[in-house]
């Protein structure tokens, strides 16, 4: 109440002066806030400019370094001598053309050209060896080692089929038909023996093994 009374008793000039002082202090406070905000914006703008400037300088330096590296590589380029193609490779000591022959993958596996071609006389000798290996699967049948029976049959039958076709193609026309009939019968019995091994049937395997041996003997007798 005393303060209010003092205000009432104060002169208009005093009140006007106090209002001017208070108003100026408020204006000064708001001005400081604006200046602080502007300074923050200026600092952030300067930081972004510095970052972009550094990135541009880095890209230019990388481009110059890459260009100098390429020039150095081109300057030090050495010619490479290319020699002749390698010699034919294979499993035999004299080397074979087996790995260098074209393969017709559209054909069935048993007809596909993937074995080393031999003259008829050498093909006949290899056919006899393949026939012996097929006959030697009997102990595997007795032990019921069916996967091994199938592996040996398929491996040796592939060689035998290829060599018999070579021999038949070299025979006169009147001998070709009889040999073709015998080979067809032979491979039918081999397929039956393979199927018996797949079914793990000892009785069927014994039956078709005997038929295979008989057919092999007939074919070998024709070969001489």
Curated annotation (Swiss-Prot):
Which terms are listed as keywords in the entry? Chloroplast, Membrane, Phosphoprotein, Photosynthesis, Photosystem II, Plastid, Thylakoid, Transit peptide
Enumerate the GO terms in the molecular function aspect: calcium ion binding; mRNA binding
Q: Where is the transit peptide?
A: 1-44, 45-75
Top-rank taxon of the source lineage equals Eukaryota
Description of what induces expression: By light.
Q: Is this entry keyworded Protein transport? A: no
Which Gene3D superfamilies does this UniProt record tie to the protein? Oxygen-evolving enhancer protein 3 (PsbQ), four-helix up-down bundle (1.20.120.290)
Q: How does this protein lie in the membrane?
A: Peripheral membrane protein
List Phosphothreonine occurrences by residue: 189, 212
User: What subcellular compartments does it reside in?
Assistant: Plastid, Chloroplast thylakoid membrane
Predominantly, its location class is plastid
Pfam families per record? PsbQ (PF05757)
UniProt lists the family membership as follows:
Belongs to the PsbQ family.
Q: What does the UniProt function comment say about this protein? A: Required for photosystem II assembly/stability and photoautotrophic growth under low light conditions.
Specify the protein name: Oxygen-evolving enhancer protein 3-1, chloroplastic
Species classification: Eukaryota, Viridiplantae, Streptophyta, Embryophyta, Tracheophyta
Gene name, Swiss-Prot/TrEMBL: PSBQ1
């Amino acid at each position: 109440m005393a303060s209010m009374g003092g205000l009432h008793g104060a002169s208009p000039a005093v009140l006007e002066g106090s209002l001017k002082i208070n108003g100026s202090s408020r204006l000064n406070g708001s001005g400081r806030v604006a200046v602080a905000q502007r300074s923050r914006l200026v600092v952030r703008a300067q930081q972004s400019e510095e970052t972009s400037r550094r990135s541009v300088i880095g890209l230019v330096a990388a481009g110059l370094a890459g260009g100098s590296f390429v020039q150095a590589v081109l300057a030090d380029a050495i010619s490479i001598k290319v020699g002749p193609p390698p010699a034919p490779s294979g499993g035999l000591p004299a080397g074979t053309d087996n790995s260098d022959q074209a393969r017709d993958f559209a054909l069935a596996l048993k007809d596909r050209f993937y074995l080393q071609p031999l003259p008829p006389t050498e093909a006949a000798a290899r056919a006899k060896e393949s026939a012996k290996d097929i006959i030697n699967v009997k102990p595997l049948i007795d032990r019921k080692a069916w996967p091994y029976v199938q592996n040996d049959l398929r491996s040796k039958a592939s060689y035998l089929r290829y060599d018999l076709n070579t021999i038949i193609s070299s025979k006169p026309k009147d001998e070709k038909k009889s040999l073709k009939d015998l080979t067809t019968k032979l491979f039918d019995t081999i397929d039956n023996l393979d199927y018996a091994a797949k079914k793990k049937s000892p009785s069927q395997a014994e039956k078709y093994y005997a038929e295979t041996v008989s057919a092999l003997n007939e074919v070998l007798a024709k070969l001489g």
